[in-house]
């Protein structure tokens, strides 16, 4: 082992954070970068970066540098004793805990002392009664007077003491509650049961000595961000959708972040996936039914093939902070996108203390053109919904998260917003439209048989929806139904009515007619005049060999 000529010590939280790259809640981690200067001696130097966070991701530390020096080794070791530094914030919480503990113990001790006084008086009365029975006392007028005085003293004193007990019991319950809260706060710091931490040992060789700059990058767990949207739709001839895009950061890393340049990433580091999964040959064959046995019940057909789904992603590289675009009303985050993820550089430094459940930052604000339409899914809910259809023409990929929806300034509801990458179509439900009445008739099924060599079963399904437009203007209504999607060449599905065209996805601007998506979702759009009541029928036929049984399974 090389001889260390000089050891340099510094505490991690004394080094400013250059950047905090926070990943989504699926990853629950963040990557931090800190840069510091060190004056190296000639030869081998050891730089000890002390008090690494408790939630450090193992093997995530990497060190780079600038200057005339060579980095030979980076390792993580345990540090104990005097070098273990507890942050001031934690010391303050510990002091409160100790104060509440002393207050609780003081009340408990006072109660014990009062209880002992009561027990002493009770024992005195017991002893007097015992000696009276064995003849030790000669009862005369003075004895009776003394006993009466003793009993009176006992009664008055114990009544007062028991009142003190009841008061102390109340004080003790309050003190125990405050102690429990302080104890929980102390537990939450992560420092209560720890007497050691870790440090990074960096071995650096310098040929001539002098100043060098080192950058340490590491990952911590229990940090994440989730998106939140404020979506405001304005109706009218030219409807618009105003979107304000927020990020909510949760920070439980064990260290405080002070004025940190913040970057939010949509990447999902997969720490547990080390290599590309392997696939075997997937063979497909016809299932041959087993002979039926007398088991008192009916046998079923075996199921299909299931695969485990593994999502792989790697962390996007750290990026330099860019200048945010400035606006009179709202700051914006600079966006950097790669093939697998996007990064939002927040426009202002953030101060996020440890144990912060929600720190809200603004990512961006933009306006999208939108088309309003009415949609009903009568098989699920016989009501018409007002829907805003838009295309994400912004620079921001929209990540799935919660959204607050407003229509013309009025709050509609909170909903779960789905992913919408740049240029992707999406829709936002604006609530129920009470001016369009929907009645879904009972589904009618007809069975037919045909064929001479092979018997074919044909099932005709007829779904009828009655609608009434109570608006003073004409409206477009889309009736959304699902048709069976065949996964077997022996199963054939034919749409009888209405006539429909096949499309890759539903149009942003609905038009009169019917369209079928690859998922066999039928959008049947009709025009309704003011006050018009009409009935619309969706009818399709499902054909399959009579000897086979069809199983329907809805997949999203």
Swiss-Prot record:
Query: GO CC: one term?
Result: mitochondrion
Q: Which residues carry the post-translational modification N-acetylalanine, per the record?
A: 2
The region annotated as signal peptide is none
Q: Which InterPro entries match?
A: CHP02231 (IPR011935), DUF4139 (IPR037291), DUF4140 (IPR025554)
Please list the disulfide bridges.
Answer: none
Instruction: Kindly state which keywords UniProt assigns to this record, in alphabetical order.
Output: Acetylation
The record's Pfam families line, in alphabetical order, gives: DUF4139 (PF13598), DUF4140 (PF13600)
The record, for NCBIfam families, names: mucoidy inhibitor MuiA family protein
Name under which the protein is recorded? Protein F37C4.5
